[in-house]
């Protein structure tokens, strides 16, 4: 072995536990969550990338006899690979990496049920959901309420807890999906796995978030169930690194007083999670392994060949410059302000009338603008959803309720002419002005937004009472590209606006 190869091998080995080569008295569960179609290393951090992830997974498998690989949802949506190819790339990647178990995230539903079935039926992993009743859907035959894997002479039972779709997933894109109480479902199936399937260990894969306030989350799941050894979570993009000085809490007592480990890797494949079950004392530990450039010399040529025909068009779109910025934008408030102002200005063109204000959601922004050139790829990746601009005619009373809904979530994006003082704990706005004037509950306002919010999703139920008076036929990112290439943003250098328009 050359010195260079030896050095590379040592770098990989540093990611492994010291006793890994000698130990066979443990089970290693590798896990990911919320990778969001980030196939290449993420442009903002340089971390992640499926080539590196596979190198790390292969290294663990080569050094550990008892390994399982699982994912906790939101494999898709967030890059050009999904926008252009609709899940085909992610399907091939998950199979190439050899995932054993996968669950649904909310973004798996983004393209609707028929495309979802096409994506799911091509996966090799076991597909499970414990608290979605899918009997009225077109994917019911693809899922089981749990799965059992035998490894290291032990039986490992997996169950899956999914997020409440109400107000989060467009109902038109999730037909036939019924939500069941997550705590009741988890307790029932955990009991079944322990007592009927005779599992030695039970792992819950979840896509409900680590700490969600008044909603079901991983902390609640840990504390109000029994029989579950670990929860491998997703949805909230939480990094739980027990070695960090400011680490999120990772160990909780369940109903029986037993310890439950809660794990999550953050987002975008920046880390690979590792949950280890010690077969000598039945203890469970967790950690995260950063997916960095140290792995670049260990890429799998077969995976590279799988990706090659998809990477070429993605790289081409990423090379088309459409605009410029004076400096990099942060997500909140700068990207949020820019999106809100764009939607308001462009909607005036669409509706051919004065627009009173705009409302957008931070969840609709998946990336940020860099300093310098903005490319077509930047726009499509930052605003990847199939949203359309709409203009609502809505009463001042219902508009005020919508702004209260925004306050309940800590503030979303509003146009530059809006100022609000929020009481987040009280879930209301104490004071709101539009163009310096308070909202008149009896007046009709014309509000620019996106169809997803106009449908009452993402907590914006009051907007359902408005009437759509104008709707763009284009996706939002196409309207943006048109504005950059031949509209009001042509040859305009963007400057970030850091004004906090809704204050606490």
Model regions and ranges:
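Feature captures C-terminal
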Residues: 25-28, 38-41, 45-48, 52, ...
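Gram-negative bacterial Sec-dependent N-terminal signal peptides
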Residues: 2-21
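Sec/Tat-exported extracytoplasmic proteins
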Residues: 36-39, 43, 57-64, 106, ...
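Active-site metal-binding motif and surrounding structural segment of the metallo-beta-lactamase
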Residues: 23, 52-72, 100, 197
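Active-site-adjacent helix-turn-beta-strand microarchitecture at beta-sheet edges
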Residues: 24-26, 31-41, 68, 76-180, ...
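Conserved acidic residues
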Residues: 66-67, 100, 200, 229, ...
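Short catalytic helix/loop segments, enriched in acidic residues and glycine
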Residues: 45-58, 91, 179-186
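Hard-cation-handling environments
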Residues: 284-374
